[in-house]
Amino acid sequence: MSWAGSKRRQELPEDWELNYRLPVLSAAGWLCEVDGPGCVRAATDVDHKKPGNDHSRSNLQAICRVCHGKKSAAEGVARRRELKARRKRPEQRHPGRR
């Protein structure tokens, strides 16, 4: 994930590295738990399975940089689609149609 211009890191707990990131990576044997296409297997990142600030162990997974980039990109595309759909007016039925 690119941290450039992101405020995401500021939202993480101060003890993120020691009490969240390292235990998650260690428990996974430093291997990617996503194992998607192009996976490099060596986990270097910890990802939130569901976006947000839920830092519970059940919502965290070890992930390689390739899988993390693809997952983050897909989440970004989905979010932009959602926001675009909200901007459209709801389709109105023609008053003469039942």
Curated annotation (Swiss-Prot):
InterPro entries reported for this sequence: HNH (IPR002711), HNH_nuc (IPR003615)
Biased amino acid composition, Basic residues: 81-98
GO MF term (any one): nucleic acid binding
Domain named HNH: residues: 41-73
Region (Disordered): 75-98
Transmembrane regions listed in the UniProt entry: none
Protein name per UniProt: Gene 4 protein
Species whose genome carries this gene: Mycobacterium phage D29
The organism's taxonomic lineage, starting at the top: Viruses, Duplodnaviria, Heunggongvirae, Uroviricota, Caudoviricetes
